[in-house]
């Protein structure tokens, strides 16, 4: 008969394996103790609408050795130097770093910023990350907090574009404008001046997964404004994230487009959890919603810009296999949408909502 200690160890290991195997992204790489010997395997693990994202896979490893920042003429070894190169790069960090950027950091296409193995903090009172007309970008394993507004100033956008005057920015943690194929995974985001993630101006093919969003009011905006109908082609997957504590609203807030919100865990909200305007399609599947204690805050959803309930009755907002606690409820509308929204490369298994707390227990930066 096995000893009690051995049984306890086996139970513990089985719990870990179960956690990884149920979360398709984590099971793809976290079970390999030698992941640091093949960092680029991470690019094979993305699911959902961003599943084609390559990041810097196939390129060189670039190591950040300095936390210094020069917005116009960055030096080799700094994060800005690597992020603005034209070629594919897999960016890693030589040591723990606190980086306060002087101006927004423009991230060029075919880049992975991989914080695994180091404790990397961005923001710290400065502006943060910006992507414009970029494709194939992966951001993984970063603490992004305290992002602040920036003033008008010159910034190196990329090697090919060069230095441009950049308008003042709002203080978002991550801004994506006209971006295709991007994956934001296992980051911890909080306490910024405006939003934590903005996906706008025709961006599509985006997966936002395994992140921890907390201590912030306006979390995630998908879609530019109600007049920008190019965002009708937007497709975003929001999966395996932990929202809260102290997350106010916009988890996400969508305009136009198609958003699949799957296996996320919501630890209350201040105004609403999922909202939108301009007739977005929102498919909520297998999420766990715990409502605030106030009786007037129980509804998960908020339709914005509808003078009457009938005005947005045809918007397709569906709840499937979600779990509701403390009086939370989801107001569905529209005709049932075809649930086969993914191709074979994008599709992933979605568990019932009562499994979401386990699936998200390792959300955020993994130590």
From Swiss-Prot:
Q: In this record, what's one Pfam family? A: Pectate_lyase_4
Residues listed as glycosylation sites in the UniProt record: 148, 178, 293
Cofactor dependency: Ca(2+)
Q: Which residues bind Ca(2+)?
A: 170, 194, 198
Superkingdom of source: Eukaryota
For this protein, the Enzyme Commission number is 4.2.2.2
* SUPFAM superfamilies per the UniProt record, alphabetical: Pectin lyase-like
Q: List the disulfide bonds.
A: 28-45, 128-147, 306-312
Q: Name one GO molecular function term.
A: metal ion binding
Gene3D superfamilies recorded: Single-stranded right-handed beta-helix, Pectin lyase-like
- Function in brief: Has pectate lyase activity.
For this entry, the protein name equals Pectate lyase 1
This chain's source organism reads Hesperocyparis arizonica (Arizona cypress)
The taxonomic lineage of its organism, from the top, reads:
Eukaryota, Viridiplantae, Streptophyta, Embryophyta, Tracheophyta
């Amino acid at each position: 008969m096995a000893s009690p200690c051995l049984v306890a160890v086996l139970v513990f290991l089985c719990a870990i394996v179960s956690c990884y195997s149920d979360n398709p992204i984590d099971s793809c790489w976290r079970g390999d103790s030698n992941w640091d010997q093949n960092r680029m395997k991470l690019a094979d693990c993305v699911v959902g609408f961003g599943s084609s994202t390559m990041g810097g896979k196939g390129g060189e490893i670039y190591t950040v050795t300095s936390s210094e920042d020069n917005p116009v003429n960055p030096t080799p070894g700094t994060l800005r130097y690597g992020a603005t190169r034209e070629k594919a790069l897999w960016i890693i960090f030589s040591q723990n770093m606190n980086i306060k950027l002087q101006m927004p950091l423009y991230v060029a296409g075919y880049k992975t910023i991989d914080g695994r193995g180091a404790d990397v903090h961005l923001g710290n009172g400065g502006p943060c990350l910006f992507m414009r007309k970029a494709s194939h970008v992966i951001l993984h394993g970063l603490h992004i907090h305290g992002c602040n507004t920036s003033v008008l100033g010159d910034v190196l956008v990329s090697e090919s574009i060069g230095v441009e005057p950049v308008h003042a920015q709002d203080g978002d943690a991550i801004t994506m404008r006209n971006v295709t194929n991007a994956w934001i995974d296992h980051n911890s985001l909080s306490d910024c001046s405006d939003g934590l993630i903005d996906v706008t101006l025709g961006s599509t093919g985006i997966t936002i997964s395994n992140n921890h969003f907390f201590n912030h009011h306006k979390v995630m905006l998908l879609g530019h404004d109600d007049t920008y109908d190019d965002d009708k082609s937007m497709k975003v997957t929001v999966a395996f994230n932990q929202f809260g504590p102290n997350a106010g609203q916009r988890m996400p807030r969508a305009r136009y487009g198609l958003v699949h919100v799957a296996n996320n865990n919501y630890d209350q909200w201040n105004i609403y959890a999922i909202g939108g305007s301009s007739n977005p399609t929102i498919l909520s599947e297998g999420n766990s919603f715990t409502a605030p204690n106030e009786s007037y805050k129980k509804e998960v959803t908020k339709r914005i810009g509808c003078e009457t309930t009938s005005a947005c009755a045809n918007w397709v907002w569906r709840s499937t296999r979600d779990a509701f606690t403390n009086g939370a409820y989801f107001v569905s509308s529209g005709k049932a949408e075809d649930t086969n929204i993914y191709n074979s490369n994008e599709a992933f298994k979605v568990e019932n909502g009562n499994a979401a707390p386990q699936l998200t227990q390792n959300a955020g930066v993994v130590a």
